[in-house]
Amino acid sequence: MIKSELIDQLAEANPHLYHRDVERVVNTILDGITDALARGERVELRGFGAFSVRHRPARVGRNPRTGESVAVKEKHVPFFKTGKELRERVDASRESNPEIA
């Protein structure tokens, strides 16, 4: 699912709201999560999961095309840890529908 599909699904489930208002709400939520992560804060959505920022130290990588060594700078990256309810729900759906890979 992509963001526009999420917006469409939410707008369909809430016909009393205008599509543009649903889009504005989704964008505001995502902007809030992004801003909090940019400040180094942790964002927890109980039952769904938690977003945080992790430090990746500098390392030596390889260019896959040429095989030459390349210095990769240290950086901070977003990290998501799933919540217990989300893990259990996904696992249950896989057990009841084994053709999902």
UniProtKB/Swiss-Prot annotation:
**Family matches, as InterPro entries:** Hist_DNA-bd, Histone-like_DNA-bd_CS, IHF-like_DNA-bd_dom_sf, IHF_beta
Xref: SMART domains: BHL
Keyword Hydrolase appears in the UniProt entry: no
Gene Ontology MF terms in the entry: DNA binding; structural constituent of chromatin
Could you tell me what this protein does? This protein is one of the two subunits of integration host factor, a specific DNA-binding protein that functions in genetic recombination as well as in transcriptional and translational control.
Q: What is this protein called?
A: Integration host factor subunit beta
One protein family per Pfam:
Bac_DNA_binding
Subunit architecture: Heterodimer of an alpha and a beta chain.
Q: What gene does the UniProt entry assign to this protein?
A: ihfB
Q: Which residues cross the membrane?
A: none
One Gene Ontology term of the biological-process aspect is: DNA recombination
What domain of life does the UniProt record list for this protein's source? Bacteria
Keywords of the record: DNA recombination, DNA-binding, Transcription, Transcription regulation, Translation regulation
Source organism (scientific name): Maricaulis maris (strain MCS10) (Caulobacter maris)
What's one GO-annotated cellular component? cytosol
Family statement drawn from the similarity comment of this UniProt entry: Belongs to the bacterial histone-like protein family.
